[in-house]
C-alpha cells in the first residue's frame, strides 16, 4: 500500500497505476518508461501498462515517482513517473523459467536467456532474449443495475438503462417516455420503456491473451561506455475501459531502440514505436449499429407504442377500478387530475403482473416486426444472423460506414540526449529531446481521411543544478525545462 497511489484494473490483462488522486483508466498525465523509453501507444495516446511491456523475469528495478516531474521528464509527467529498468545481460546471465496458474483459467509462462563475454579491459558483447505468454478468462462485465442516467428503475415493466447492456439508453427527444399528462391519458400503463439492448458478454471477447517478446544486443567499448540495440514486440487481446468499452483484439506493438551510454555520465538514445490496432472495436457502438441494422430507434419505438394502443390500451381501460377516460374524460383534467392519476397508479400496482406481461408482448412485437423495406427483426445473440451482422460491423472502419472497428497504424520517433558535467562546486545536468508523431487512423481516431497525412513534432530541453553541503547531508537542486509542441506555445517547467 503506497500513499497516493491507486491501481485500477480495466480488465485482467490491463493494470493501470495512477498517482495524486487522478484515478483513471487512461492516465495520459503519467509517464511510463522502460529503459528510458516511453511506453505509450502513439495513436491511442495512453500507456498500455505491462500488457505490452517488459517480461517480469527481466525487470531489475521499478521506481515510482509520485508527483509532478515535468522538470526532467517533460509535461506528460504531470502526475508522476513509473520508471522500469530491465536487467543487463552482462550482469544477469543464464536461463530463467517461470510459470504460474490461477483462477479464471489463468496460465502464464516466461523464459529469459542471457549470456555474454567480456575481457579484462571491459570490452565485450552480450545478448538477452525474453519470451512471455499469458492466457486467461477475463472478468465479465455483468452489472445490470440501472445507470445514473436511467429514468426508470429495475422494477419498471418497460425496462431500464442497465450499466453493462448497450443500446438500451433513452431514445432521443423522450420518444420512449409516456409518463406525462398526455401519456397518462392516451397510453395508460405504457410509461417509460427502453429498447432491447445487448449485454457486453455478447459483444466482447473475454479470452485474454498476451504474448511478449524482447531481445537486446549490448556491446561494451570499455568498462564505462556501451552501445545497445533492443527490440520489443507485444501482441494480444484484452478489454479496455475508456469513454466506452473497447475490445482490443490482436493489437500489436513494437519498439526499436538504439542507445550509447555511460552510466551516470551521458546517453544518446533513439527509438521508434509502432502500433497496429488489429481487429479492435468499440463494443458500445457495435451494439448501436446492430440495432440500427435491424431498424431505427424511431421505428422500434413506434412499433412498441402502436402495439400498446391497439392491443393493450383497451385491456387497461377495462381493468377493475380504472378511471376509463371514454366513460368519464373530465376526471383526467382540472382539480381532479391528480387524484385520478393516483387511482390509475393503484390499479397498475394491483395488476402489475398483467402490466409486465403486456410490456413483454409489446417488446416482442417491436423486436420481431420489420414493417419497412430494409428492416429486420432483432438479432438474437448466438444465431447465424447475429454472427453475420456482428462480423460485418466489427470489420468496417467507421461509424458512418456502419462499422465500429478502429484502424490505427500510428508511430512515433524519439531522440534524446543527456550529459552530466561535474565541476568541483556542483553537478550540472543538461539534456534535450525531439519527437515526431505520425498518426494513421483512416479517420477512425484522427481527421486523416481523404488522403490527409498528419504529422506532429515536439521538442524540449532541461537544465538541472545540484549542490551538496554539510558533508553531503544537505542537497539543494534546481531544475528548469522548456518544451515546444508544434501546435502550442512554449511551456516552462521550473522545479
Which residues are covered by each model-predicted region?
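Outer-envelope beta-barrel architecture signal
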Residues: 28-30, 91-95, 107, 121-127, ...
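Hydrophobic, lipid-facing positions within transmembrane beta-strands of outer-membrane proteins
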Residues: 15, 80, 93, 107-111, ...
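Short strand-turn segments of transmembrane beta-barrel domains in outer membranes
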Residues: 69-71, 81, 86-118, 131-133, ...
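Outer-membrane beta-barrel domain signature, strongest for Gram-negative TonB-dependent receptors
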Residues: 154-428, 432-435
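Extracytoplasmic beta-strand/coil segments of soluble accessory domains associated
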Residues: 2-38, 60-61
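Short acidic/polar hinge/loop motifs at secondary-structure boundaries
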Residues: 38-66, 85
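Short sequence motifs at beta-strands and strand-loop junctions characteristic
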Residues: 9-11, 74, 102-105, 203-210, ...
Amino acid at each position: 500500500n503506497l500513499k497516493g497511489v491507486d491501481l485500477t484494473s480495466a480488465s485482467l490483462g490491463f493494470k493501470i497505476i495512477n498517482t495524486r488522486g487522478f484515478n483513471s483508466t487512461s492516465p495520459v498525465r503519467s509517464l511510463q518508461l522502460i529503459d528510458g523509453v516511453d511506453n505509450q501507444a502513439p495513436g491511442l495516446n495512453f500507456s498500455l501498462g505491462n500488457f505490452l511491456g517488459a517480461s517480469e523475469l527481466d525487470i531489475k528495478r521499478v521506481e515510482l515517482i509520485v508527483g509532478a516531474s515535468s522538470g526532467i521528464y517533460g509535461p506528460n509527467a504531470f502526475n508522476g513517473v513509473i520508471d522500469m529498468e530491465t536487467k543487463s545481460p552482462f550482469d544477469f546471465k543464464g536461463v530463467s523459467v517461470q510459470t504460474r496458474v490461477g483462477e479464471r483459467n489463468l496460465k502464464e509462462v516466461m523464459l529469459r536467456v542471457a549470456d555474454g563475454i567480456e575481457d579484462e579491459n571491459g570490452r565485450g558483447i552480450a545478448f538477452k532474449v525474453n519470451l512471455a505468454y499469458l492466457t486467461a478468462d477475463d472478468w465479465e462485465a455483468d452489472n445490470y443495475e440501472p445507470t445514473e442516467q436511467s429514468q426508470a428503475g429495475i422494477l419498471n415493466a418497460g425496462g431500464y438503462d442497465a450499466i453493462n447492456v448497450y443500446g438500451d439508453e433513452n431514445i432521443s427527444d423522450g420518444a420512449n417516455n409516456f409518463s406525462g399528462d398526455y401519456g397518462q391519458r392516451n397510453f395508460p400503463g405504457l410509461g417509460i420503456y427502453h429498447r432491447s439492448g445487448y449485454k457486453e458478454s455478447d459483444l466482447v471477447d473475454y479470452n485474454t491473451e498476451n504474448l511478449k517478446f524482447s531481445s537486446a544486443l549490448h556491446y561494451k567499448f570499455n568498462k564505462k561506455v556501451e552501445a545497445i540495440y533492443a527490440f520489443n514486440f507485444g501482441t494480444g487481446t484484452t478489454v479496455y475501459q475508456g469513454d466506452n468499452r473497447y475490445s482490443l483484439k490482436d493489437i500489436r506493438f513494437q519498439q526499436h531502440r538504439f542507445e550509447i551510454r555511460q552510466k551516470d555520465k551521458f546517453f544518446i538514445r533513439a527509438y521508434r514505436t509502432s502500433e497496429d490496432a488489429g481487429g479492435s472495436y468499440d463494443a458500445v457502438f457495435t451494439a448501436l449499429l446492430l440495432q440500427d441494422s435491424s431498424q431505427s430507434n424511431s421505428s422500434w419505438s413506434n412499433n412498441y407504442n402502436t402495439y400498446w394502443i391497439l392491443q393493450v390500451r383497451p385491456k387497461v381501460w377495462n381493468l377493475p377500478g380504472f378511471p376509463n377516460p371514454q366513460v368519464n374524460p373530465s376526471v383526467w383534467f382540472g382539480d381532479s387530475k391528480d387524484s385520478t392519476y393516483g387511482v390509475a397508479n393503484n390499479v397498475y400496482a394491483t395488476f402489475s403482473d398483467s402490466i409486465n406481461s403486456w410490456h413483454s408482448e409489446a417488446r416482442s412485437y417491436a423486436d420481431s416486426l420489420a414493417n419497412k423495406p430494409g428492416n429486420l427483426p432483432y438479432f438474437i445473440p448466438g444465431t447465424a444472423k447475429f454472427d453475420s451482422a456482428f462480423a460485418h460491423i466489427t470489420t468496417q472502419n467507421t461509424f458512418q460506414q456502419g462499422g465500429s472497428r478502429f484502424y490505427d497504424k500510428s508511430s512515433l520517433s524519439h531522440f534524446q540526449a543527456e550529459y552530466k558535467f561535474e565541476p568541483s562546486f556542483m553537478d550540472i545536468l543538461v539534456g534535450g529531446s525531439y519527437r515526431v508523431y505520425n498518426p494513421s487512423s483512416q479517420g477512425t481516431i484522427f481527421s486523416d481521411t481523404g488522403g490527409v497525412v498528419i504529422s506532429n513534432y515536439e521538442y524540449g530541453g532541461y537544465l538541472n543544478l545540484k549542490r551538496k553541503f554539510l558533508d553531503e547531508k544537505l542537497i539543494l537542486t534546481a531544475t528548469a525545462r522548456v518544451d515546444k509542441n508544434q501546435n502550442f506555445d512554449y511551456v516552462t517547467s521550473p522545479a
